[in-house]
Design a protein with these regions (language model features):
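Active-site-proximal loop->helix
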Residues: 142-150
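Active-site phosphate-binding strand-loop segment of PLP-dependent enzymes
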Residues: 155, 160-211
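Conserved PLP-anchoring active-site segment centered on the Schiff-base-forming lysine
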Residues: 122-141
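N-terminal "arm"/small-domain region of PLP-dependent enzymes with the aminotransferase-like
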Residues: 12-78
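Conserved N-terminal alpha-helix of the aminotransferase class I/II PLP-enzyme fold
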Residues: 66, 73-114
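Short, small-residue-enriched loops and turns at beta-alpha junctions
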Residues: 57-58, 85-89, 141, 162-163, ...
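Short, structured coil segments at secondary-structure junctions
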Residues: 129, 149-151, 210
């Protein structure tokens, strides 16, 4: 039997491996230098950073840093020692949710650990097995995975293609006439992986015609 490491070395030129050398240090494991924020250094050059969840530099604001330091001093850096669903749920989560709900003038609020989880849960909460999901073929992975979890039908249309989207909506409409369900049409305002702009104005127009 071939040694597992020999197999890895042998197949390192596969679909992903062949790009590893070119991607390393750029697309993969890019090394940013300087204070975390919207402006940092990459390979010796000043760059505008969009790959951190700190686009506007709010994490560097003096008040935010002060709150971080006070929380670490009071509860320690390791608190709350567990995911929220298990043993990590605290009164701080609940207080923050109440403050968010009050700020937004809503009945309640719920915090997710990350956006991916929020999107999956939203799609699941909106749909039942009689409904149809229609989504862009290059939608973000969280949208695609949310659609895949759907127990009913799901259909894709070609990326940012108005005609393909309309034809798919026509198919979905015929199906919903049989099931009595509705249609969830998914696109993006800005596609995060490419920067392409979604045709939101046309999407709204189509959705008014295909309910």
């Amino acid at each position: 039997m071939t040694d597992i490491f020999e197999r890895i070395e042998k197949h390192s030129g596969g679909p992903l491996g062949q790009y590893a050398a070119k991607a390393f240090g750029y697309y993969m494991f890019p090394k940013l230098e300087g204070e975390l924020g919207p402006h940092m250094k990459f390979q010796g050059k000043d760059v505008l950073v969009w790959s951190l969840n700190n686009y506007l530099g709010l994490a560097n604001h003096p008040e935010v840093r002060k709150a971080d330091a006070e929380a670490a001093a009071k509860w320690g850096l390791a608190y709350p020692m567990g995911s929220r669903m298990m043993t990590g749920h605290t009164d701080l989560h609940e207080r923050f949710e109440r403050e968010l709900a009050d700020f937004e003038r809503k009945e309640d609020a719920f915090l997710f650990n990350f956006g991916y989880q929020g999107i999956l849960s939203t799609i699941d909460a909106l749909m039942d097995r009689h409904d149809v999901i229609v989504y862009d073929s290059e939608a973000h992975a969280c949208l695609i995975d949310g659609a895949r979890m759907h127990m009913g039908k799901r259909m894709t249309y070609r990326h940012n293609d108005y005609e393909s989207c309309e034809k798919t909506l026509q198919r979905a409409t015929r199906l919903c006439e049989e099931t009595g369900g509705g249609i969830l049409l998914i696109t993006e305002g800005v596609y995060g992986m490419t920067g392409a702009l979604g045709f939101l104005d046309k999407i709204v127009e189509l959705k008014k015609r295909y309910k």
